[in-house]
């Protein structure tokens, strides 16, 4: 029985070490003036100076959700996931997405597949109000079986509006936005457990929710201290807001049925579930005490399922009611 993400083939700790090895080789890749990097602690997007603002850049893919979507004949929405994984990261630094490019690698040309991917990419860009300005298609049968999909998003933010987590404070309220399902993380483990139930399958391949328009509306109404996109690593993403504080989640959003089923099916420990999956929590927003009522009003008007899930406190780490 597979009980952890590592046993399914994805070792998060090993992945972090491998990424660190790559980053260690990147010294001397900066320039002065426009294009000069703006330092961010564990930022969700890379930032470089441009005039009186900054370009924000993200790149990401969909991962093994592609395989489940293929099995369930749901490839027409997988492009939404690709856009979402990038633009949801961009808005965490306060940047508005401007343009997106995709990369498709194939083992052979497939016009039906490409049309399905294109439909999803177009819908994702419409939801994010983002121009799809280009892309690359590579037929590489020696490297790829079936296909892979990734993309890059670029946004812009005024220098004074960059959200870098430096204003997070003890007592800030944490607002949670509901996810639409597992989004695009944990699918190597999910595929080991899935039993081909069509109802569950529909929940598992639901496209990643795009929070761009809701968060942009919020940024225009409330002073937002930090945002965290809850993706791979689960709750640990909260520490990317500002690791000098403790994040207390004592009023979590309801856990969707799909996650309960996965936990029972795989006999997975709660700590592993919350490290691998979003558990119904797609985005977390930190605002000052006193601003939470207005923030909730704006978010709910924008169509989000949102609630106060906890607070920022003195200390370090993450505390979640389900793990106590």
Where on the chain are the PLM-derived regions?
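Glycine-rich anion-binding loops of enzyme active sites
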Residues: 49, 53, 62-63, 81-82, ...
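Glycine/charged-rich beta-loop-alpha catalytic/anionic-binding loops adjacent to active sites
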Residues: 61-74, 102, 196-200, 267
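Short, flexible active-site-proximal loops enriched in glycine and acidic residues
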Residues: 88-100, 272
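Acidic-glycine-rich active-site phosphate/pyrophosphate-binding loop
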Residues: 52-57, 61-63, 191, 253-263
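N-terminal glycine-rich phosphate/pyrophosphate-binding loops that anchor nucleotide-derived ligands
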Residues: 1-91, 129, 133, 169, ...
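Glycine-/charge-enriched secondary-structure boundary and capping motifs
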Residues: 2-7, 24, 113-131, 142-147, ...
């Amino acid at each position: 029985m597979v009980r952890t993400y590592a046993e399914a083939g994805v070792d998060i700790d090993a992945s972090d070490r491998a990424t660190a090895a790559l980053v260690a080789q990147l010294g001397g890749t900066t320039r002065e003036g426009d294009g000069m990097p703006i330092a961010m602690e564990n930022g969700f997007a890379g930032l470089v100076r441009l005039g009186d603002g900054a370009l924000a850049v993200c790149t990401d893919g969909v991962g093994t959700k592609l395989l489940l979507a293929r099995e369930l004949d749901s490839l027409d929405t997988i492009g939404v996931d690709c856009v979402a994984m990038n633009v949801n990261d961009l808005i965490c630094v306060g940047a508005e997405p401007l343009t997106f490019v995709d990369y498709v690698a194939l083992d052979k040309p497939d016009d039906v597949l490409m049309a399905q991917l294109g439909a999803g990419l177009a819908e994702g860009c419409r939801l994010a109000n983002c121009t799809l300005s280009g892309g690359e298609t590579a037929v590489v049968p020696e490297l790829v079986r079936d296909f892979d999909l990734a993309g890059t998003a670029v946004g812009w933010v005024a220098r004074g509006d960059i959200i870098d987590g430096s204003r997070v404070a003890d007592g800030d309220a944490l607002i949670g936005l509901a996810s639409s399902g597992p989004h695009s993380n944990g699918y190597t483990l999910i595929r080991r457990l899935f039993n081909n139930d069509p109802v569950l399958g529909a929940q598992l391949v639901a496209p990643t929710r795009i929070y761009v328009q809701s968060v942009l509306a919020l940024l225009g109404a409330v002073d937002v201290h930090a945002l965290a996109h809850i993706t791979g690593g689960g709750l640990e993403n909260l520490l990317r807001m500002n690791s000098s504080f403790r994040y207390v989640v004592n009023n979590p959003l309801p856990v969707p049925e799909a996650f309960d089923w996965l936990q029972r099916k795989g006999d997975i420990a709660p700590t592993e579930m919350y490290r691998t999956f979003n558990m119904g929590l797609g985005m977390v927003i930190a605002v000052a005490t006193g601003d939470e009522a207005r923030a909730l009003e704006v978010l709910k008007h924008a169509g989000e399922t949102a609630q106060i899930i906890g607070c920022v406190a003195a200390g370090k780490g993450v505390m979640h009611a389900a793990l106590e």
